[in-house]
């Protein structure tokens, strides 16, 4: 499948402080954040004009699910648009607090762990054909996903009883199963719950919940681009060496703690391989595969960065990727800070900096400041992101959903939508079922809109 439907769901950490002290509980902050949403959507679970879904998830975490996208830059743009949507809610909520005489600063973090050790996720969705053998896909994909943090981890300072250590991934410590149908209780790497949000006879949705939330656009593109390409190669029957892991859960933690990528992890049958070995195998297959594949500039960019990052890890010289990979950008920032102020990695100020890197408020968040200085690479533009806040992807089913929502809101009509249904809540209860996520034009939807 060379054209694939993809989406990213991001849960955001939330807190409210007043002069540095916590002011409101996460529940209370979430209520202020979503008050404007509830006022027009009558719910804290809504679909937006850009085709995305915005809702309050378990544990008072605002969650943004992008609309269906069918190319990488489109997906990165709509992922960033989610930050803008949440930032707007944050600014509105702070104003409400001020108006009510409460005061306080609200923070939304695009990260995966809080100070209490709780974890929240960044889930990737990839449409795959139903006819494929799912067990083979998960078998080949699992070693790739366990070691992928080497190229696209967000980085984290982990405080251990002995000392603080810098890790590749925020999510690795919180994953407890390889493949499972649960998402919260056991936190698997691949979630098998079969909800295709499409024609179930043709498709299923691969739900990957092991990835970190990325701030850097180039890293997000690398994360989803490599996974999508590996899926495409599996579907095309490309053979891969067997890297079945003896214990994926132990392996994912071992990989996260090894910035050299060289520490051997145990494979099934007693063999060993390093994260670098495993990633090199997938990368070399990708380079080979691209020689016979239809040319695609975005995929070529992904494979180029993949190779440069693996070279950087191998040589431990990150100069050629230090604006493109989140964990590399963050580690360089910490090292400069430590050198300048002569402090240990365990210093609380480094932990504060770690958190501030993920603050989505422009002008305040550390990553935003780095990006403005040209220290973090861009894939999109501010204008494209602003457009994606209100405009759905024009090449997928999201266009139909977005146009329907816009028309219904402008006509003052009551409506209900989900990923596949568009419904006018009138006497006739007219509903259109959109089972094909690739389809951006539908006469039935046009007629439904015209009837308003």
From Swiss-Prot:
Q: Name the positions where ATP binds.
A: 53, 66, 419
Which positions in this protein are listed as binding Mg(2+)? 9, 55, 63
Spell out the catalytic residues.
57
Q: Name one GO molecular function term.
A: magnesium ion binding
Keywords assigned by UniProt, alphabetized: ATP-binding, Ligase, Magnesium, Metal-binding, Nucleotide-binding, Ubl conjugation, Ubl conjugation pathway
Q: What's this protein's function?
A: Catalyzes the covalent attachment of the prokaryotic ubiquitin-like protein modifier Pup to the proteasomal substrate proteins, thereby targeting them for proteasomal degradation. This tagging system is termed pupylation. The ligation reaction likely involves the side-chain carboxylate of the C-terminal glutamate of Pup and the side-chain amino group of a substrate lysine.
The protein, known as:
Pup--protein ligase
Miscellaneous information on this protein: The reaction mechanism probably proceeds via the activation of Pup by phosphorylation of its C-terminal glutamate, which is then subject to nucleophilic attack by the substrate lysine, resulting in an isopeptide bond and the release of phosphate as a good leaving group.
Q: Recorded E.C. number(s)?
A: 6.3.1.19
Q: Which InterPro entries match?
A: Pup_ligase (IPR022279), Pup_ligase/deamidase (IPR004347)
The primary gene name is: pafA
Organism this protein belongs to: Mycolicibacterium smegmatis (strain ATCC 700084 / mc(2)155) (Mycobacterium smegmatis)
């Amino acid at each position: 499948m060379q054209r694939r439907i993809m989406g990213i769901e991001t849960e955001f950490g939330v807190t409210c402080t007043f002069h540095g002290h916590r002011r409101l509980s996460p529940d209370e902050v979430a209520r202020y954040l979503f008050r404007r949403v509830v006022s027009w959507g009558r719910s804290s679970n809504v679909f937006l004009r850009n085709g995305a879904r915005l809702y309050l998830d378990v544990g008072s975490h605002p969650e943004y699910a992008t609309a269906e996208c069918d190319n990488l830059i489109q997906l990165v743009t709509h992922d960033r648009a989610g930050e803008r949507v949440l930032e707007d809610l944050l600014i509105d909520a702070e104003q409400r607090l001020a108006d009510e005489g409460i005061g306080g600063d609200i923070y939304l973090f695009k990260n995966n762990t809080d100070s209490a050790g709780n974890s929240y996720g960044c889930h990737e969705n990839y449409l795959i054909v139903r006819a494929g053998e799912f067990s083979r896909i998960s078998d080949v994909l699992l070693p790739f996903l366990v070691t992928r943090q080497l190229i696209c981890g967000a980085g984290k300072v982990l405080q251990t009883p002995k000392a603080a250590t810098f890790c590749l991934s925020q999510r690795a410590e919180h994953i407890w199963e390889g493949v499972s149908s649960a998402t919260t209780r056991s936190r698997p790497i691949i979630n098998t719950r079969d909800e295709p949000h499409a024609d179930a006879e043709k498709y299923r949705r691969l739900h990957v919940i092991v990835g970190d939330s990325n701030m850097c656009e180039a890293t997000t593109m690398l994360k989803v681009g490599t996974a999508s390409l590996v899926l495409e190669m599996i579907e095309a029957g490309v053979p891969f060496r067997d890297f079945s892991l003896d214990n994926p859960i132990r392996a994912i933690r071992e990989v996260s703690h090894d910035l050299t990528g060289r520490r051997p992890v145990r494979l099934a049958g007693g063999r060993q391989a390093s994260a670098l070995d495993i990633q090199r195998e997938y990368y070399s297959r990708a380079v080979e595969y691209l020689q016979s594949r239809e040319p695609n500039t975005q995929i070529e960019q992904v494979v180029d960065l993949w190779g440069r990052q693996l070279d950087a890890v191998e040589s431990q010289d990150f100069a050629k990727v230090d604006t493109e990979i989140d964990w590399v950008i963050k580690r360089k920032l910490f090292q400069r800070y430590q050198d300048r102020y002569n402090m240990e990695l365990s210093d609380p100020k480094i932990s504060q900096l770690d958190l501030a890197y993920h603050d989505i408020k422009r002008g305040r968040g550390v990553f935003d400041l780095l990006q403005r200085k040209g220290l973090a690479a861009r894939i999109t533009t501010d204008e494209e992101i602003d457009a994606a806040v209100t405009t759905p992807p024009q090449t997928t089913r999201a266009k139909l959903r977005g146009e329907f929502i816009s028309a219904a809101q402008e006509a003052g009509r009551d409506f209900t939508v989900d990923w596949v249904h568009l419904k006018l809540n009138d006497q006739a209860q007219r509903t259109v079922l959109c089972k094909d996520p690739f389809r951006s034009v539908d006469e039935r939807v046009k007629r439904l809109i015209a009837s308003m």
